Amino acid sequence: AWNKGFKEYFAVKATPNPYLLQILREEGCGADCSSYTELLMSDAVGFKESEIMFSSNATPAEDFQLARKLNVTINLDDITHIDFLEKVADIPDTVSCRYNPGGHFAIANNIMDNPGDAKYGMTHEQIIEAYKRLLAKGVKHFGMHAFLASNTVTNDYYPELARILFKVAVELKEKTGA
């Protein structure tokens, strides 16, 4: 990989096949799970806790409880998930938050997608508040996730996404200390 700390996480919901997951694990990928069943499957094929990310929305208590039992990284989709996670399980030392910058996502003059219409992720104001609340609850390590366009094949997508996320990361550090 271009960065020794980089890990690709495969979206298990795209192809929830244990044989494929086993191959991906052997090749060094992680598993991005969005449900209880996907967490169970990823654990069963041998992914370690650090190799599993749990990203879901409208999350049932049982899903958060299993994610905590497996000690995987939880990626919160909504600011209200903070209190719900604390109520049904506990807040881990490491938490990731999904960011939605809103508006249109464009590369050059082409609009790639409209994240502002998406129901997923936290707004700019919400992610700042989420980091403050999570810090107050003892979180020590933070991640940030964004998904701004589907089926993107241009080479410009990831550098532009990284630019957006790094800009927000700097602001989060300045405003929250996280």
Regions found by a protein language model. Give the residues of each.
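Active-site-proximal beta-alpha core segment in soluble small-molecule metabolic enzymes
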Residues: 7-178
